[in-house]
Amino acid sequence: RNCYDAAKKYSKDTFVIIEKLGTNFLPTLFELKRKVDLLSKKFNFLPNKLSDKLMQFLSNFWPNHLPKRMDQFRNKYEHHWIIEMSDDGIDEAKLYFEEFFKDNEGGFFECTKKEGKKALLHRFVAASAFGRYHAIHKKNLGEEMSLDIAFPRNEKNWFEKLPSEIDDLIEIKLYYGHLFCHVMHQNYILKKGVDAKR
């Protein structure tokens, strides 16, 4: 849920740009960002990461870009799983989940084509939320740390339980993973003053 919320707020501009202009525009976007940030370094009165701060400010004026049913599931469940199926696999997955959730906690819904595109795009831009959050709030935060954890195929416990002496050093944690690959991306922003190397 934390990752969903962070991506919704801090990756909104990237989501909208890709949705409206396509991924082919990304190199142009990154070049524009680079030029703005280089320009801001030449003038002391302009903040570092000006492009991120400007894009974040402008994104506040764009309406909610996510489907209502996705937000409802965000409110209902802490963890979300996006499964993309095709052909006969669609009905097979639907039948499986209908049976599975008769006896297990959770729920599912079959996305419309539009919802499916938005769900996948939201997951795609989630990685950028971590860097944007840090860029916007940097003066109140410590360093960033990212880990990619590969799990054995039979591992069922994906979520770490850090000892309090480590957990207390972390300001924010964002997790997202690839279940069929058994990889979890764990992103941390440390509290201000914490030595990441230590």
Spans of model-derived segments:
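Noncatalytic alpha-helical scaffold of FAD-dependent oxidoreductases
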Residues: R1-R198
